[in-house]
């Protein structure tokens, strides 16, 4: 499971990550990843934080909670790939309710890799 200290809880963190992070779109997920942190928050870094957005379009309460559990578990496995100052928001699309856990995990892994590559400076990308 995703440890509490790695869960995004403040609406301001969600807003900043979605607004300023790099978005990658997949079949069942939309991932917003923000590398680094605003100057005021750098002192209190406790590790990467992950937030979930699972709307009613995904399904009823039982389905939404099942999708949330799958995404939290997949995110917990991928925490070592993130820097301590990273913030990630995962938005579940309606098709995520029927997706396999392995598929969600792979989409999440691909999203992190693509977002990280897009945020690298151009000089480092060409190496």
Swiss-Prot record:
Its EC number is 3.1.26.5. GO terms for biological process: tRNA 5'-leader removal. Residues 107-127 have a biased composition (Basic and acidic residues). SUPFAM superfamilies: Ribosomal protein S5 domain 2-like. One of its GO terms (cellular component) is ribonuclease P complex. Belongs to the RnpA family. RNaseP catalyzes the removal of the 5'-leader sequence from pre-tRNA to produce the mature 5'-terminus. It can also cleave other RNA substrates such as 4.5S RNA. The protein component plays an auxiliary but essential role in vivo by binding to the 5'-leader sequence and broadening the substrate specificity of the ribozyme. This is Ribonuclease P protein component. The gene is rnpA.
């Amino acid at each position: 499971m995703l440890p509490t200290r790695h869960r995004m809880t403040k609406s301001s963190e969600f807003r900043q990550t979605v607004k300023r992070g790099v978005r990658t779109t997949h079949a069942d997920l939309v991932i917003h990843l923000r590398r680094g942190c605003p100057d005021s928050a750098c002192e209190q870094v406790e590790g990467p934080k992950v937030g979930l957005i699972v709307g009613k379009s995904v399904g009823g309460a039982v389905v939404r909670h099942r999708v949330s559990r799958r995404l939290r578990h997949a995110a917990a496995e991928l925490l070592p790939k993130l820097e301590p100052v990273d913030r990630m928001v995962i938005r579940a699309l309606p098709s995520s309710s029927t997706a396999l856990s392995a598929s969600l995990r792979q989409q999440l892994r691909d999203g992190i890799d693509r977002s990280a590559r897009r945020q690298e400076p151009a000089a480092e990308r060409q190496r």
